[in-house]
Regions:
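Extracellular glycan-modifying ectodomains
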Residues: 1-389
Length: 389
């Protein structure tokens, strides 16, 4: 067969030619495209090319497993391929969940939480006991505010027949335990439900919005006899196109991005290194917001510069408050500047000590434990609130 005949026979397989050219082109693009260390869309670290030294150190199978993962993570157009897959699955297959995230009405996303994990069943009693101990050691000073999940406030937007965890029984038990131990439980479920027609939770993220946090803050002020932060007297700033943690898992093609709102405040934040219990050192002073984070994927990290072990906010009020928190408090704390002169913020993920020495040195007027219910059931570090001495 001459060359002309071979060429003519190949033309009978146009699909084969197209696919061959496609994969050759994709391979070439992979070769010339720089590897990425991090995927902002997925909020995850990407695999890097395994060193040839691993071949002899770990064996052929282990090396090729690592190399296959590297190729998968670094494929050209990875974000676009993931979005295409999501579009096909949600549009053609009518999927109601993706990546462990339930796709609800009004473009809301919910974590697929059908019950407490076995680890959470062990952690929840420990954290409850720790907070009870804190209430008993500082009677009349401890306030506990647990933010309910968005699914608890917007059950009508959860996909039909999804048997999500009912938090109410647990929250009722926690309320009773806190009050019996001499603390105050600030139950915000009713307040948030009353305002559910407003933008209280992000659609694509697991946090509440600054507005949701504000309504919870107002209820705390009512309980403590404080005048709330006046939002009308301050300039509200916004950042659009926020895709949060739920989106990073679900990666739906038609997700509606969120908007972050914060208030332009001149108050200062000092972030400390802590080398011993209650002994902060090497403070770095900055503003309340890390606006550089608005240019990256995790925009919510702008509030309080993320989850620092110990930081102090300079307020405009009087007295001192200690906030023991998860990231739900990050957009809540700025409102407290209207009420207190000093707002100390502890995040046990990065604070490896108990609280008694810090409290003894600072003499707080109030203590606020602010977590989401989800974090309260799973945080392996909150037990430190119950450590005495």
């Amino acid at each position: 067969m001459d060359k002309h005949a071979k060429r003519s026979s190949l033309l009978h397989y146009p699909v084969l030619i197209v696919f061959t050219l496609f994969f050759v082109g994709l391979f070439a693009l992979d070769l010339i495209t720089p590897d990425r260390a991090y995927s902002e869309m997925e909020n995850t670290t990407l695999s890097q090319r395994p060193a040839l030294t691993q071949l002899s150190a770990k064996g052929l199978n282990s090396y090729f497993t690592a190399y296959t993962k590297y190729v998968k993570d670094q494929v050209f157009g990875r974000d676009q391929w993931i979005s295409l897959q999501s579009m096909v699955e949600t549009t053609l297959l009518q999927k109601e969940q993706n990546g462990g995230i339930l796709l609800g009405k009004e473009h809301m996303m919910f974590p697929r939480t059908f019950g407490l994990l076995s680890s959470e069943e062990r952690t929840l009693p420990k954290n409850t006991s720790a907070v009870e101990s804190l209430c008993q050691r500082y009677p009349g000073k401890v306030n506990v505010l647990l933010a309910p999940a968005a699914s608890d406030i917007y059950p009508e937007n959860v996909p039909a027949n999804a048997p999500l965890l009912d938090e109410n029984t647990y929250l009722d038990q926690l309320s009773a335990a806190v009050q019996a131990a001499g603390g105050r439980f600030v139950d915000v479920r009713g307040t948030l439900t009353d305002h559910k027609g407003e933008y209280l939770y992000y659609r694509t993220d697991h946090h509440w919005t600054s507005l949701g946090a504000y309504y919870a803050y107002q209820q705390l002020c009512d309980a403590l006899g404080l005048t709330p932060f006046d939002t009308a007297a301050h300039t509200a700033l916004t950042a659009d196109r926020f895709y949060g943690t739920h989106y990073s898992k679900a990666r739906t093609w038609n997700a509606v991005p969120d908007t972050i709102t914060w208030y332009d405040l001149p108050n200062q934040l000092t972030i400390y290194n802590v080398t011993a219990a209650g002994q902060p050192t090497d403070g770095e002073t900055t503003g309340l917001y890390d606006t550089d984070k608005l240019t990256v994927y995790d925009k919510y990290a702008m509030f309080l510069h993320g989850n620092n072990g110990l930081s102090r906010v300079q307020g405009d009020g009087t007295g001192r408050i200690l906030v023991i928190k998860d990231s739900y408090a990050n957009c809540f704390v700025p409102y407290l500047t209207a009420n207190y002169a000093d707002i100390d913020v502890v995040d046990f993920r990065n604070y490896n000590f108990g609280l008694d020495q810090l409290i003894a040195d600072t003499d707080y007027d109030q203590i606020l434990v602010l977590y989401s219910f989800d974090s309260f059931t799973s945080d392996p570090y909150l037990y430190r609130a119950g450590v005495t001495g």
